[in-house]
Amino acid sequence: MKKIILIIIVLTLGSCNNNEVKYLNKEYSIEVRLDDLMSRMTLEEKVAQMTQFVGLNYITDADRNMTAEEILNSDSRASYRGLLKKDIAQMVADGKIGSFLHVLTMREANRLQELAQKSRLKIPLLIGIDAIHGNGMVAGTTVYPSPISLASTFNENIVFKIGQETAKEVRAHGSHWAFTPNVDVLRDPRWGRVGETFGEDPYLVGNFGVQMIKGLQSDDFSGFDNVIACAKHFVAGSEPVNGLNVSPMDISERSLREIYLKPFKRAVDAGVYSVMAAHNEINGIPAHMHKELLTDVMRNEFDFEGFYVSDWLDINRINVLHKIAKDFKEAIYYAVDAGMDMNMHGPNFLENVIELVE
């Protein structure tokens, strides 16, 4: 939900003081500042808060290390054909990007935030990073044991403390959002992402997921020692056909509710701010456009009040992988209509959403 995203953004404006503009004045309540900001935003500026790009240096590394064929045919690293770094920087300054992921240095994070301050409303960027066992993508940070190793200790307090320390290191490097915990319930040991999970038992996975969320977010997001947690991957991608990541999942309603949905219900009850959708299809419907699960179950039944983010390029995969949408624009329609709030990642999302609304 765009409003939830903006509440978090407004919290990062706490150091500003401008008596003429309420949303920039920390003397007003969050609700007053948020209402003031929303009233000033154009459609383009609202959709920009749903638009995420990969960090500029991450793109440079991909371009440097990938062959021309890999850039054309692989989406495992970020490469935006036809867009230069200066073009993306200008989009930030124009208020057309609301979020980045994988910004790997404080210097780059600060530079991107400086560019965002040039935009009309000066809305800060929301920056996220994969931190599944510590802020390990960033050089010099603490790397903890993988989640499957942590779960084998049966010591939930360790996970809580790791969440606290990870949050400090993530914030210290300019990010506000950690794409963790992974609360997939592992049921096929052939699956290549075993190490990211807390194991095969829904109860244990739920317990460890809750402690990680509490450690990362704490009780008050207004400080500098906590980050947004992200429960992933919603849902049921951990017992795929032939054990292959991204493969479809055929599952009964009973198994879905008794096994795979339980940790997400626990995460919602723990106050998780964000949820990431899964790569896979569930009974023939891609998770990123599964309105029954995203809206009917999570929003209406579980009372999830945070926001959804897609997994890596998965909205476009409704077209290129699942073959349901005829193009990216139609894929966006299906995803946003189902409840998706933010696209990870890249160009053409902003323009297509605006066209669909208009």
Predicted regions and their residues:
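Glycoside hydrolase catalytic-domain context in secreted enzymes
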Residues: 16-358
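Sec-dependent N-terminal signal peptides
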Residues: 4-13
